[in-house]
Amino acid sequence: YFGMEHKGRCVGNRINAYTSDMDFHGGSKLSKLTYPIKTIYSKEARVQLRKVLDDFQPDVCHLNNFNYQLTPSMILEIVKWCKETNHQCKIIFTAHDYQLVCPNHMLNNPNTHQNCEKCLGGHFVNCMKGKCIHGSTAKSAIGMMEAEFWKWKGTYKYIDTMICCSEFMKSKMDSNPLFATKTVAMHNFIDKVEWKETEKKDYVLYFGRFSEEKGIGTLIKVCKELQDVQFIFAGTG
C-alpha cells in the first residue's frame, strides 16, 4: 500500500513511505499558499512512491483516488521506474467518481443543483465558468488547471485498464477517446452471506450515500407523489 499518511490509515508498506497529510481545512497560512500547486503536482509523492517501487518491485500498480493529494504525478514515476529498471508493470485504475472527466468529480453543478456534463470531452474551462467547485471561482480555476495540465501531459495514456463501478460510469468515461478502449464495468464487491427466505414485501429501496448528485432530491419528490408506495432509504450522508 502507498498513500497519504493520516490517522485513519490501517494498511501500510514495509519501509513506511507515505506522503504528508494534507489538511485543506487547517494548517498554517504558508502551507495553504502551497496547496494549489501541490494539488496539481506532487514531487513528494514521486519520491516516496519510488522508495516503495524499489522495495516491492510490483508487477501491477492498482491506483485509487489519486487526484489532489497524491496527484497523477505518481503515474509518471511508475512509468519512469519501469523504464529505468526494465521492469514491466501494468497500471490499473479504479474510478470511484468522475474526476478524470469532470473537475468537481460529480457531474453535477452544486450551484444550480442540476446534473451537468459540460466538461465531458475535455472542455474543462466550463468548471471555472460554472464555479463548480464549492461555488468558488478560485477553487474552480485550480480544478480546471489540474485537469488541463494532465490532459496536456497525456499522462492518463499510461493507464492500462480503468475499472468503473457501473455501466453508467463506463459510458461517461468512454466520452474520452483515450479511455474508451481501456474501461471495464465491474461492480463493487460485497461479502457473501447465506441467503434466507423472507416474507415478500412490495417497496422501493434506495441503498447508498445520501448526496445530492445521486438524485436523492428527485427521489424524495417522487415519495411525495406516490404516497401509497413504501420507500426505504438505507445509507448515510
Each predicted region: which residue ranges?
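N-terminal strand-loop element at the rim of the active site
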Residues: Y1-K43, V47-F56, G237
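Carbohydrate-associated surface elements
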Residues: E5, F168, F189
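Short N-terminal targeting/anchoring amphipathic segment
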Residues: K51-L70, C89-T94
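A short beta-strand/loop micro-motif in the catalytic core of glycosyltransferases
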Residues: I92, K157-E167
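Membrane-proximal helix-turn-helix segments that form the acceptor-binding/catalytic region
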Residues: Q99, N111-T161
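Conserved donor-binding/catalytic core segment of Leloir-type glycosyltransferases
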Residues: I163, K196-K214, L219-L226, I232
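Acidic anion/phosphate-binding donor-loop and adjacent secondary structure
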Residues: D174-S175, A180-D202
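Short donor-sugar binding/catalytic loops of nucleotide-sugar-dependent glycosyltransferases
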Residues: F189, F207-S211, G237
